[in-house]
Each structure stands twice: as structure tokens, then as C-alpha cells.
From Swiss-Prot:
Protein name: Histidine ammonia-lyase
Residue positions, PTM 2,3-didehydroalanine (Ser): 147
HAMAP family per UniProt: His_ammonia_lyase
Gene: hutH
UniProt signal peptide: none
UniProt superkingdom: Bacteria
Subcellular localization, as worded in the UniProt entry: Cytoplasm
Organism: Ralstonia nicotianae (strain ATCC BAA-1114 / GMI1000) (Ralstonia solanacearum)
PTM statement from Swiss-Prot or TrEMBL: Contains an active site 4-methylidene-imidazol-5-one (MIO), which is formed autocatalytically by cyclization and dehydration of residues Ala-Ser-Gly.
Family (UniProt): Belongs to the PAL/histidase family.
One example of a Gene Ontology biological process annotation: L-histidine catabolic process to glutamate and formamide
Example of a GO MF term: histidine ammonia-lyase activity
Species classification: Bacteria, Pseudomonadati, Pseudomonadota, Betaproteobacteria, Burkholderiales
Keywords, comma-separated and alphabetical: Cytoplasm, Histidine metabolism, Lyase
Amino acid sequence: MTTPSILTLHPGEMTFADLRRVWLAPTPVTLSGDCAAAIEASAATVQAIVARGEPAYGINTGFGKLARTQIATHELEHLQRNLILSHAVGTGQDLDDNVARLVLLMKAASLARGYSGVRRVVIDTLLAMLNAGIVPCIPSKGSVGASGDLAPLAHMTLAMLGEGDARVNGVRKPAREALAAAGIAPIALAAKEGLALINGTQVSTALALNGLFLAERLLQAATVAGALSVDAAKGSDAPFDPRVHTVRGQAGQIATAAVYRGLLAGSAIRRSHLVGDTRVQDPYSLRCQPQVMGACLDLIRQAGATLLTEANAVTDNPLVYADAGEVISGGNFHAEPVAFAADMLALAIAEIGALSERRIALLIDSTLSGLPPFLVEQPGLNSGFMIAHVTAAALASENKSLAHPASVDSLPTSANQEDHVSMATFAGRRLAEMAGNTATIVGIEALAAAQGIDFHRPLATSDALARAHTCIRSRVAYYGEDRLFAPDIEAARRLVLDGDLGDSCRAHLADLALA
């Protein structure tokens, strides 16, 4: 097995490639050497405030509504430990390992920028856990996205203290046991360190990044499936003419139309009906793909830009400015930008699925597609894709409800001290469910379109789409007669979610990537 190359963490400068590496697989991470001075100066500033005894929020005071209560110096370590124990009140299923790895990475990156007042050992412990494959068990529910992701990040911090549970290679065990096996000492929190660890938007951002990377795969797979559907239905490629899109000027639409042209170029199926086709215009689900999918691309990229900024951000409170010896209370923990970005991704994911469902409906309707009813030989004896489409319709409808913006809601907490919140954590968390729904829809479309291509033989589709067809048929055989279909749909869903369908046409999809 090849050892993965080490990722050098440059706080404030992480790229999508960096984040995607950690999201995809365990990756060894080391901290850039130029962070040390800022970290040490920030920690020294906090210790100086403690030594002077002057009140500073989160350093020697209570928290939230209890901020006016000053804590004696000899109680400060106890204060930080109490903070973690009292705030670890999350519920629900644990975050998946890939999301939890992003949380650890982004928390280390934020603290290492030197505005949080923590010692180097705190950052080193986070990275040591990441490198040892120790994934804290972080419940996915319990955060309102301000003041930071308090409850889930408290569960992350529990593992650093040797409390709570963690997973190693998928096996859940006591965190203290996992740390000991890796030779990592549990930490004792100094002044402000507990607050710095739990104040921040890293959980919301990790969930939203998970949705972002899945949305990128969905967009690419649905574009391939949509192009296959055009050929399967003997649709026209004229709507993808660059002149149509240039006069509108929408960047995503222009890029997406070019992708469709590349995917369909050279199709013998298309050449077979260039002359004598009495259809003047295709239905919108075929003809308007660049307009819809291009808008989704623009939305995904806009959300991505926000999330990349947030992944590199300092979202702690209060912030420590070592150069001035000051501590300033602010509100960078408020995850409204993340909530908005996640809501935008939800719209894109829902719309990708909605358009795909409409193309399935077109393909199974012989009056629209010219293909056998429900895409099966001997219709009547066989039901073919009839109920597979019903499943797609059910999931498309479900996504429409899940796409309701989470950010429009707010409930005051902490005795009205925290009186407006973002709901960013739920905004990000529901994206995985929505992506799974859309992947199933697009997978069903891919099967339906491949079936349509098969019916046109000996006419062949384009070289690019032939590779997609081969990819589909490598997992799911031609549907000659009714059979148990659920395993085939699951296999197609995995082709979409794992990125294999998009990868089959990778050379044509560069303009649909985030970076």
C-alpha cells in the first residue's frame, strides 16, 4: 500500500484540494513551521491577562449569560474542564468519519493562526489525533450555529481530554484507550483553551463542505446522464449552440452548454435524425439543461467560495491580539455565511434531482421518447422502469421539502443573551440526505438512458457517452425483462455518489469542477 504524502497545513491558506484530500481519506498532516511565533505570542498574552487578574471574557469569567461572574485564578483550569463537560450535550447519530476529520483539520487551522490564545500542545493534540486515525464521536445534533457549534465541538474536545468515545478504523472505543494506544497524552486545558476549542463554526462548515463536494459530483454525474438522455430520446444538440448562450452571458450556462456539446459530439444516433425530424423543439428537461444546470453550477461555486473562506477563518470569541495585548469580544462564531451557503447548496441539489426526474418521466413515456413503453421489451408482461420512476418522483418531492431554507429560522438561547442564531448545522447536515436522494434519482436516469441507448443499436452514441454507457453496464446489466431492480438502483446510486459516472467522462467535465 502506498503511503499518502504529507499535507502541510498553512493556516489561512487551505485550498479545496487540501480539504478534499482529508474528506476523501485519512491524510497525514503537519503544521507549517511559520506558525509557531504567532501561537506562542497569543498564548503568552492570555497568560499575562491571567497574571494581572483583569477580567476578560472566557479567560477568567463565566460564559454566556454568566459572563459577569469573575472566576478565581486557581479555578481557571477547573472552569475550562467544566465548560467542556457541561456543553457536551449533543444527540443523534455521530458525524461520519470524513466530516469529523474536516472538523479536526479546520479547528487546528483556526487555532494555529494565533488569535485564540491556546498553547501549541492543543493544536499538536488535534493533529496527532487526526494522524493516528482517532475520530472523536461527535453527535450530529445539538447546535444552532451560534455561539459556534458548542455542543458538537465539546464532544470533540472530550476526546482530547481522554473522556467520551472515539472511533479508530471504524471501531468505537473509549477515547482514553484510543489515545493511549497511539501514545497521545490527554491534555489539561489552560485558561481560555476550552472556550477556544468549542467556539467556532467548524462543524457547520464541515457538514456544508461535505454537501459541497457531493453536489459537485451530482452536477457532473447528472450532466453525463442528461446528455445520455438527449441521445436516448433522439433529442437535438442545437440548443447547446454557443451562440444561444453567449447572448445571455451567464457564466455557468455558457460553461455547461460547452460540456454538453463535447459529450454529444460525434454521435451516430444524432446524425440519424438530423434530416426529416418533424419535432421542432425538445421538452424543457432536455433543451434547457444548460440554463438549469448552469445556474446550479453558479450557485455551487458561490457557496464554495463562501465555505473556502470560512474553512480558513478564525471564528473564535473572544479574539486575542498579541501585538496590542488586547482581547476583543466579537461574533465571528455566528455561522450565517455558512447557513446561507448550505441553503444555496440545498437548492442546487434539489434542482439537479428535479430536472433528472423529469427526464426519466420523458424516457419512459413512449409518446415523448419514441422508445418502448417503460423502456422494456414486451411491455405489459414486463413493467420495466414504471415504479423506478415513482421512486425518483418520491425522492424529488422529499428534497423539495428538505430544501426549505434553514437560515430563515432562529430561536433565542442562553436566557436571550444569544438571541439570534443561524441554524447552520442543520442547514449543512441535511445536505447529505438530499445528496443521497438526488444520487438515486440520477442513478435511475443513468440506467434509463443507458437502456434507451441500447434500444438504438446498431446506431452508436458519441465516444464520450459510450464510455459512460460502459461504466453503467459494468455495474448493471441490460434490463431485458423484469427482475429484482433495487440492487441495480443501489449500484447506480453508488456510481453517482462515488464519482465513477462523472469520472468516466472526466476529460469533458473540467469546466464543472470547483477547482
